[in-house]
Amino acid sequence: MSQSPRIAVVGAGLGGAAAAKLLLQEGFNVRVYEQAPSFSRLGAGIHVGPNVMKILRRIGIEDALNEQGSHPDYWYSRHWQTGDVLAQIPLGDYAVKEYGASYLTVHRGDFHALLVEALPDSVMAYGKFLTKVEDRGNVVVMHFADGTTEEADIVIGPDGVNSRIREELLGPELPKYAGYLAHRAVFPTPEVKAGMLPFDACVKWWSDDRHMMTYFVTGKADELYYVTGVPVEKWDLNDRWLESSKEEMREAFSGWHPTVQALIDATVEVTKWSLLERDPLPLWSRGRLVLLGDACHPMKPHMAQGAAMAIEDGAMLARCLKEVGAHNHELAFALYEANRAERASKVQRISHDNTWLRTNEDPSWCFGYDVFNVPLVEPKVKAAA
């Protein structure tokens, strides 16, 4: 193992943790560098579709997540005012039969904990905030805020929308404000009935310019989560995360259905944050550096597939490194990008447009995807200058 190329994963988020575990399973020499001092239960709700559950099966945490999460029978889309059903997408047993795994909603922190717990303590290095990375041709040197340096043969950057690895590849560039704020809250399921409707296990309420997505985040259905998309023309990107309030929510969703009002009334704490995007990048790798997840294709959360794309990226990158060998990393990176860029860009575009499942449509291209069995596409050969 000591002679194996040293693979550094910078960031132990969902995509980074999944990539690290899958690489370890393939026998690679992996070290994970995480800026947080320790693991903590962060985030709120998250969708985990069959396309991701098939990866978690390989990792070995599918059953545990199935036990933790809520399993909606349908994704409902409803009219903001009347509550009329705009779309009813079958999930539940249908998803298992048609797509090969379940569809669930769960607390992001609980999901993340399962992924991190799947990694040996010996590969984790906490308190490592990357300040600089140097690809010296034969080795990569990473500099951290604690004054330490580390070397690796390959550096994977699942380090988010403000990725240091992306900055090294393409230079500094601020992400674009998408023109929307999102509010989110997690709270105990209200005891009261909500207007004329019960609380659907998974529902998105739509108007012409804004929405609210709500679902349970536990198998017991004792915690509810909502996340919104509300247009705000200008925003100071220095204020990424802020406290919000019931009053602000009532103003943003004035006149909406009684069920939505009941959710706002039951809110304990609510925060808001700005939604950021980037245009598709001209490259995902160079030399010994490679990106995945939000580092190369950040997207609005309106398709509930952002984390899924990062985890799929990690799985495909591990597959490509196994396919051609880590010593041939540039070919592996080209193969990885050739097999991920089109799908990630499609999800990024649909997320931007915020049209996903607003009407009845076939989601099989998304949910039925199996990263381990999809035929690999060869990278395009660049024309000679």
UniProtKB/Swiss-Prot annotation:
The active site is at residues 47, 215. It is an enzyme of class 1 (oxidoreductase). Its cofactor is FAD. It catalyses: 6-hydroxynicotinate + NADH + O2 + 2 H(+) = 2,5-dihydroxypyridine + CO2 + NAD(+) + H2O. InterPro entries: FAD-bd (IPR002938), FAD-dep_Monooxygenase_BioMet (IPR050493), FAD/NAD-bd_sf (IPR036188). Residues 1-20 form the signal peptide. The gene is nicC. Inhibited competitively by nicotinic acid with a Ki of 0.49 mM. Inhibited by thiol-specific compounds p-chloromercuribenzoate, DTNB, Ag(2)SO(4), HgCl(2), CuCl(2) and N-ethylmaleimide. No inhibition by o-phenanthroline, 8-hydroxyquinoline, EDTA, disodium 4,5-dihydroxy-m-benzenedisulfonate, fluoride, azide, KCl, LiCl, NaCl, BaCl(2), MnCl(2), MgCl(2), PBCl, ZnCl(2), CoCl(2), SnCl(2), FeSO(4), FeCl(3), NiCl(2), CdCl(2), AlCl(3), iodoacetic acid, hydro-xylamine, phenylhydrazine, semicarbazide, cysteamine, alpha,alpha-dipyridyl and urea. This is 6-hydroxynicotinate 3-monooxygenase. GO terms for molecular function: 6-hydroxynicotinate 3-monooxygenase activity; FAD binding; monooxygenase activity. GO terms for biological process: nicotinate catabolic process. Flavin-dependent monooxygenase (FMO) that catalyzes the decarboxylative hydroxylation of 6-hydroxynicotinic acid (6-HNA) to 2,5-dihydroxypyridine (2,5-DHP) with concomitant oxidation of NADH, a step in the aerobic nicotinate degradation pathway. Uses NADH in preference to NADPH as an electron donor.
